[in-house]
Amino acid sequence: MGSFGVRSLVHLTSFGPQFADLLNYPPLSVYSNGKALPVRQFLRENPERYAPHFILQFHKGAALKFQDQSYTAPVANKIILSWDVLNSELPLDHGYFEYAKKNHATALLISGVSGIQQEENLDAKLKEIARLLEGFSQETMVYCECGPFFLKDGYGKYFKELGGKSDIIACSDEELFEINGVSHSSFGGNPYMLMDLLDKFFHTYHPRRGVVIHSRDVSMYYGNPLPEGRDVKSALAMGNMVASAKARYSDYGTREMVFSIADQPDSTVGLQRIKTLEKGGVIAVPTKPVEHPACTIGLGDSFTAGFLSCV
């Protein structure tokens, strides 16, 4: 969000010298002891607390070797190696939430719990986050996404605890299938199945407004209307463009990068699927797919940034 000019305040769990360049955008600040500090100042004033995740990206047909065994990747995907204690414990600064309330934040994104790998840690942390979400005014949109994928039923626990305290809950289409116990291979592009899963997701976890789903060909919103002045269709379109910019340039995306995507053709699959989805009350926008992407990591995060910048 900082890279394309949206003023944002972040809560950092892990940080070190590597963050100085990655997050050094004027609109972006870091919360520290009741203040919003520029990233470099925050890093100067706080001792390093660095705990990286390693993400290995590979293409369809790639040979993957683990010790004496070899596999051929059937699809492009990635392997996430997370070994640190810090992100699994996820220490939270409660002052960040109070600062957001006091300053009437337009939106509050709840994410980053995906590093939690112990069930007892997850249960305690979700209860803590739920308490911290109490007392926000209606002008702050609480957006909850990216569940704890290392744990069995992690997504279910996550949305069960936080769904009712959120305006919007969000995930990818693959996560939607997993949450509902449905095999992605059984989907076959069936928009009616997609509508059933959206409806089940919405009515199981009871967000105050609705659910957002992003996928390769179409992004979707299903639920109650958003407050006046919040245009969900524009937000979905912006999310799609920011994700495509990340795929094309392997970068967070300046305004110029993002808007260079605007003239790209819409997904033909998405255009076909939308006709049926809209009849079922789903607001849907086709994506702008990038052939031969330079990067496939963090596209969901980029979509979220684009969506929140407009809504």
Residue ranges and their predicted role:
Residues 297:
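Catalytic tyrosine of NAD(P)H-dependent dehydrogenase/reductases that use a Tyr as the general acid/base
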Residues 300:
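Conserved single-residue anchors adjacent to enzymatic active/cofactor-binding motifs
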Residues 2-294, 311:
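Ribokinase/PfkB-type carbohydrate-kinase core domain
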Residues 307:
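Active-site-proximal C-terminal subdomain of hydrolase catalytic domains
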